[in-house]
Amino acid sequence: MEQQQQKSAAHVSKLFVCTAVDCKDEIEEKFERSYVSLQQQIAGLSDKEMHDMLTQIVCKEKQHEEISIGFLYIILTDPAMAPKTYRDITLVSRDGMNVIVANLTLLVAEKYAKLTETARRQLIWVLREFVKHQVLSVENVIWNCLRQAGGGDVSHKNLFLVESLLDIFIEYRAWLEAIPFLVQSSVYSFVRLIEDHANPALMPLRQKEVKFTISLIRDRFQDIIPLGRDFVRLLQNVARIPEFELLWRDILCNPKSLHPTFNGIWHLLQIRTSRRFLQCRLLPEMERKLHFLASSVKFGNQKRYQDWFQDKYFATPESHSLRSDLIRFIINVIHPTNDMLCSDIIPRWAIIGWLISSCTNPIASANAKLSLFYDWLFFDPAKDNIMNIEPGILVMYHSIRNHPFVSSTLLDFLCRITKNFYIKNEDKIRLGVYNSLKLILDKQVIPNLHPLFESPKLDRELRNLIRENFREFVSPVANMPQSIYPATHSIQAPIFKKEADQRMLQSENIDVGSGAFAANSGTISLVDDDNKIAITPVESSERETEAVFSDDDGENIARCNKNDENTDDDDDLPLSKVRLKEKPVPEKVELPDAIAESFEIFVTKRNSFTWEAFLKDFRTLPASTLDETQLNYVISNTVLILRETLPQQNVFSESKTEEKYLAKSISYPLYGLFRFLYENEDKSKKPFQTLLSEICERLSETGYLLLYFMKIHCKLQTRKNAQQSYQFKTTVYRQICEATDEKIGICLVRDLDLLEKENTTIYLWLLPDIYREFKTIAINNTDLLRITLRCVDAKNVRDIMYSIAQGKLTIFKQDGLIDCIRESLEYETYEQFCLWQLIQAHDVPLKCIQDILPELEAANHPEALSHLLLLLKNEEPTSEIIRLLLSREAKTRGDPFVTSALRFWCQRCEEKLSEIIASLLTSKYPSSSPNKRKRPSKGSSAASSTPSADHVLNHLEHYRRSCRHGTGTGLYVHDMMQRALQSAYSHSNESTKKQFSDLFALAAEDETTAVGRRGGSGRGRKQPVGKKDSNNHNAGSKKNSDVVKTIYSSDENSSEEDWSKHKITQAAKKRKKAINDSD
């Protein structure tokens, strides 16, 4: 008995709180094992002996990790030994504590809830030490601690963590501000947490949070802008706090005071908040449970899971605010795959409906509804994802019949929020809601809006409100049909949906270091790649979809098989019994004999061979043979089969070289259409053209799959018959474009955009073929270029440059390239750097793009200026380049770009550069009219890029100022430059002379003449002298020899000007001696 007690006592963990029924998992065993192993090795050793022994042991990777975790265990469980143990770690660790940080990150993400009170306090202590000593990657641990600071939780345990993290951020503010992502996460988290700390007992903490958050927002607003629209939603909840009220005033009335690039509240509302910030407001454990509910629980079996979730996370009054966080996460992060959409797993809208309908707090309920429709208000079909608006319409659509209260409250809220959310931009909000509803109908997320908007179960006031707000989607009153539910149609079109991510976010574990979900062997990136194509096939008549928010176990589901007439008016039917009706079986239509047999075989066998056989018969069929009903029957069934036979995932080949994979990837019926078009280019009859048009319109991926097919088909055919050349036929693609009645350039860009979003690897693989076969469209095409630049990484750029160097790919031609560069100035920095890499790979001469030099601004176009400066370094100065450079606007502090170019040219060809600039300056002062500036003629084409005299003098003056310790001023001592400066002086007015007095002082004068004293033009070089200048010399400087003098109007002690004076004086002596010798 005693042995059993000792054995059980030995297993009591100091790190984790365990009950009698808890089993240790891998993480817990790993920490316990490492601690025991370390204790066995260092028991009875002095500090020196321990360090010596451990230093030898940690050379091996496994032992190093074990010892590091053992020390971490001691720090977390023994506060008294923590400082000494931390010193021991710093002596023993050989990887900058990387192993300790990684394991601590894992511990916080997976086991924080099970840590003892002592361990949680020690965790804060060690984090403070890590931040204090700038340990690498400690921000990963901090970020996961922020995730553990849950919303809607005012327990002592949670408040301790919140306040501890806040103290670390305040104390080490400089460290925090150096990590923009952590700045964003902390601001987003604390603005959300402040909402929960309204209790008077929490006012000191709340005030500290407010002071820190407001300070960080104002100081780092450039980092706050990417938080986007959900940050605005959180700010609304704390707007009555005085400090936030002042912030709101600045955002609305004085946005530039926060940051020069900030344009106001609409700027934030147009930015979609990253999934990472929505994720950081959910506890990791809560996130795993939510993923399980949305990916593994069948419809009808969810009630017990929802009850457990309710008891676990919604038990307190403060926890109601958590519902908004959950809804935003479900909408923006959990995007089910096609397989899940087709399965009997509980859909997203049902979970959201349960969260809203079970909320009893009116404020939390309003916030939850706003969370549901938030993306509707700013929806842009070009860049937003239909999966973010799909749950809102589906929860209303599936509730209207049997639970109209849910639908009516949501519809009322949508109508009112559209008008009142942002009155100043009501038209833009309405446009967002209109775009949402239009796309919902276009993609057939629901068949139509009549059952929802025109339901008799809505009260009259609400129906009038709907008509007022959504008149485009409501039929006139006089024409309202008797039955407002969808009628039965014999021909069904497939339903299309877009997803942000086709991969299923169903994992139970989270890789906290990289912020990605891990599902078994794969990882799901949180990088947003919206608008990928995903399909929901039409449901068969054999299967039903159950639409419920919750359900009681053991309930008899046979009631759901009643006919429509028995359930339409059943207002008492609970939400748990809501179901979709069965889809009607399409009625068969008799077809002409010429195609009836082949079409029947195709519908039955659904393979590429039977499809091509039908196309052969159908292609020559005249329009008079088919009526509209028959044609629609053929089209709808054809499109449905083509869609269903395409694989929902892995549409493309797994290998780019192995024939079996390549051939398999184009073996589906849709590719049979492409093969048929490839082999039959003759003009087809009208029914065939109509069929082709409908396929292209309903299957948006048709275009890029055709491009993929031609690449594979040509590759395979060439391998089979190397003697015959197989062409990448652009005429086939033109047929597709003609069928959709769009220009080929527009179609090509659209299809390649879809392809890149679907599969970047295949897009880059096809790129050389696209530029080769569609060269007139693709080369210098900025839209196609932008698609490429947004998806490439360093390796992709390298591969593209290889193709360019080998002559396989040409992206640019010299004519028109400058327009591409102009448009690229608005691109992201990385995209612009990649662009310049590709330009350099094409060996584009500078003369083709040099005209853009005067247009570039130092503050707005640093990327282009950086690369152009490198190109200039490889060029010799020419009159044209110098003219363009000096045409650039000279700011108050000068133009560093021009100065840099002049300096490195001075080192190589100083005299040539001096002559070019002098010639340009002299040309501004014609000798025939010394007192009059030359004006460019009205018909001069180069007038706009020709620098004025003031431009040239400005750049020369700023260049002079940049010459420290005399380096580079040799530019001014050459004869032509001296004469040019003297000429400029003699033709300048008094203000110009005063402005550039130091520059003019670098011009030497003759013994016999002086500029400014005589207006005539003598033989020698002239020196500008002012009356005041002669009085500025030191009284001690009395030696006025016959040597040429130089005059300085400011800072006579400057080393650069002393050097210049000395050098110019020497040059003047040499010239004088040469003249005397010649005499």
Curated annotation (Swiss-Prot):
Pfam families attached to this UniProt entry: HEAT_Ints3_C, Ints3_N
Cellular localisation: Nucleus; Cytoplasm
Residues with PTM Phosphoserine: 1049-1050, 1054-1055
Keyword NAD tagged: no
GO CC annotation terms, alphabetical: cytoplasm; nucleus
UniProt biased composition (Low complexity): 938-949
Segments of skewed composition (Basic residues): 1062-1073
InterPro entries: HEAT_Ints3_C, INTS3, INTS3_N
Keywords for the protein's UniProt record, in alphabetical order: Cytoplasm, Nucleus, Phosphoprotein
Sequence segments annotated as region (Disordered): 539-574, 925-949, 1010-1079
Family label: Belongs to the Integrator subunit 3 family.
Assembly and binders: Belongs to the multiprotein complex Integrator, at least composed of IntS1, IntS2, IntS3, IntS4, omd/IntS5, IntS6, defl/IntS7, IntS8, IntS9, IntS10, IntS11, IntS12, asun/IntS13, IntS14 and IntS15. The core complex associates with protein phosphatase 2A subunits mts/PP2A and Pp2A-29B, to form the Integrator-PP2A (INTAC) complex.
Protein purpose: Component of the integrator complex, a multiprotein complex that terminates RNA polymerase II (Pol II) transcription in the promoter-proximal region of genes. The integrator complex provides a quality checkpoint during transcription elongation by driving premature transcription termination of transcripts that are unfavorably configured for transcriptional elongation: the complex terminates transcription by (1) catalyzing dephosphorylation of the C-terminal domain (CTD) of Pol II subunit Polr2A/Rbp1 and Spt5, and (2) degrading the exiting nascent RNA transcript via endonuclease activity.
Matches recorded under PANTHER family: INTEGRATOR COMPLEX SUBUNIT 3 (PTHR13587:SF7)
UniProt protein name: Integrator complex subunit 3 homolog
Gene giving rise to this polypeptide: IntS3
